Design a protein with these regions (language model features):
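Short, structured loop/turn "capping" segments at alpha-beta junctions
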Residues: 152-153, 157-158, 165-174, 207-209
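Internal, active-site/partner-interface "lid" segment
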Residues: 170-190
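A glycine-rich phosphate-binding loop feature that marks nucleotide/adenosyl-phosphate handling sites
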Residues: 177, 215-218, 261
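Short glycine/threonine-rich loop-to-helix capping motif typified by GTGT followed
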Residues: 184-191, 232-233, 266-272
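Short amphipathic alpha-helix segments
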Residues: 188-209, 240-243
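A short interface-forming secondary-structure element
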Residues: 215-237
Length: 296
């Protein structure tokens, strides 16, 4: 299917599902989806941002600014996933509980506001990974127009660039909870520490990076700093004053990952339960979904 055909398919799907609520994180996919929906549906679409301690303030501000730029209406919903011990205990399917909280709030909003459907930004590449949030979408009947129209991440970036969206070349920005290893509790204090640390790193000009929260050793947690491979040289030059700044925030030790940041793989995988996703949900073309929740 050609790119123009996929665009037409997407716009037809948006018309079919109107009036529509779109889960909007400010990332590449949901930004493009909401921008297209705003063009096609006008006032019959509303973007919904889940606001919680796992969302950096900088990301929230950017999402609101971008939505205003392309003319989409947005509602901020304060979500309470951190109060759910199934989420805060940080299991491997943590993202399921986050998305279930969001989609439940969106469903209530849809009923109150007369919206017909809920949508989110899963794309065609995501269909070949195990994404716990996709199970929540299935349970709450949330549609994925980008995936259904066959649009891949690369195509969405290309179309975003054509539209002039500032997210076209934006690095992946998973929530702050993804910086905390599974099994280590997600707390407000840990999320705030990570957010402050990443603000410092960003202030030094780094573009692709993660500050990984490591389990507490003694009285304070440690951190593992990862930057993109093309920024490793810059990190070595700045480390002598960047590391002390991070330690001053509350880390007992800041390690530099010598391998740098590596994006999670998007390979298609098969297994003995081929054809079934989580919860028995069948994935397109019979592939098992590879997990992509918190490793990015």
């Amino acid at each position: 299917m050609g790119l123009s055909t996929k665009q037409i398919t997407l716009r037809n799907l948006l018309q079919e599902h109107a009036p529509l609520l779109v889960a909007y994180s400010g990332g590449v996919d949901s930004t493009y989806l909401l921008a297209e929906a705003a063009d096609v549906l006008g006032s019959r679409v509303l973007g919904v941002i889940a606001d919680s301690p796992s969302l950096p303030r900088q990301a929230l501000a950017a999402a609101l600014e971008n939505a205003q730029h392309f003319g989409a209406q947005v509602r901020i919903l304060a979500t309470q996933e951190l109060e759910d011990p199934r989420y805060s205990s940080n299991p491997v399917n943590r993202c399921y509980f986050c998305k279930a909280e969001l989609f439940g709030r969106m469903r209530d909003l849809a009923r109150e506001g007369g919206f017909h459907s809920l949508a989110y930004g899963e794309n065609a590449d995501d269909a070949y990974q195990w994404r716990p949030g996709s199970q929540a979408a299935l349970e709450f009947s949330v549609v994925a127009p980008l995936r259904e129209s066959g649009l891949t991440k690369a195509e969405i970036r290309l179309l975003s660039k054509e539209r002039g969206l500032p997210t076209a070349d934006q690095p992946a920005q998973p929530c702050l909870s993804s910086r905390i290893p599974h099994g280590t509790p997600v707390t407000r204090e840990a999320l705030t520490l990570v957010e402050n640390a990443e603000r410092v790193v960003r202030g030094h000009g780094f573009r692709v990076f993660r500050v990984r929260y490591l389990p507490i050793s003694g009285e304070h947690p440690r951190a593992n700093l990862q930057v993109g491979s093309d920024e490793m040289a810059a990190l070595r030059l700045r480390a002598s004053y960047l590391i002390p700044e991070l330690r001053a925030l509350g880390f007992s030790e800041v390690l530099i990952d010598p391998e740098g940041y590596k994006a999670p793989p998007h390979a298609k995988v098969r297994g003995k339960h081929d054809g079934m996703g989580i919860g028995g949900a069948r994935s397109p073309r019979g592939h098992v979904r590879r997990q992509n929740c918190s490793s990015s």
